[in-house]
A protein has these predicted regions:
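Rossmann-like dinucleotide/flavin-binding elements
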Residues: 1, 30-41, 48-133, 172-183, ...
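A conserved short coil-to-beta-strand element within the FAD-binding core of flavoproteins
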Residues: 30-43, 154-165
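Rossmann-like dinucleotide-binding cores of NAD(P)H-dependent redox enzymes
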Residues: 1-28, 100-157
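SH3/SH3-like beta-barrel fold
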Residues: 166-170
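Residues that recognize and position ribonucleotide moieties
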Residues: 151, 159, 177-179
Length: 196
């Protein structure tokens, strides 16, 4: 995420925190090291803190729906990480579905549209990235997307896919409309990585 527009300072924060931890004599840090229960037992230490991380869901489960979105078999479905890694392979029309309603979907739409992608931004919220209202950035984020030509579709969930189209549904009336889509980027919910 720190490679996205406006988020470069985040990497410095992470680097600083890792540096601070590494300065402690009573802490050993094993980055990017998967551990099994037997590995943990071999370490023979009393206290272990595991930061296992999480992964973005790609099935559409989020705030508005606890059920996966059906009918997406003819559409390329990506996580935010996959979209960033494969930016040159994304097929338009692209839909970013923001049912997390934090900051990432807006930043991702900004990044992809600045790199020439045609983006439709669909969200059940009444504005883009409503959480950014807490940081007084919401209006700036939405204005930037509109200036870049991002099509913003608010107050709509994605009911299902149909071929290379998505059926959206108004959160108030239930009315349905169809939009073309070859690639959907799901910014809906993260699943914790809990396995050892």
């Amino acid at each position: 995420e720190s490679g996205l527009k406006g988020l470069s300072a985040w990497k410095r924060v992470v680097d600083n925190r890792v540096y601070e931890i590494q300065q402690k004599n009573n802490i050993e840090l094993y980055k990017d090291s998967e551990l099994s229960l037997s590995h943990i037992n071999e370490l023979g230490v009393d206290n272990i803190f595991l930061a296992t991380g999480s992964s973005w869901r790609v099935d559409g489960v989020g705030r508005s729906s606890r059920e996966p979105i059906k009918g997406l078999d003819k559409i390329t479905v990506l996580s935010p990480e996959d979209a960033i890694k494969n930016i040159n392979k994304l097929e338009s029309p692209i839909v970013i579905y923001d049912d997390e309603q934090g900051y990432l979907a807006g930043v991702l739409a900004d990044h992809l549209s600045a790199n020439g992608c045609n983006i439709n931004f669909v969200t059940p919220a009444s504005v883009v990235s409503p959480w950014t209202d807490s940081t007084l950035e919401q209006a700036r984020v939405q204005r930037a997307l509109l200036k870049q030509g991002v099509e913003i579709i608010c107050n709509k969930t994605i009911a299902n896919g149909e071929g290379q189209s998505l059926v959206t549904q108004c959160v108030f009336t239930g009315n349905k409309t169809t939009i073309d889509c070859k690639t959907i980027i799901m910014v809906t919910e993260r699943i914790p990585n809990c396995s050892l």
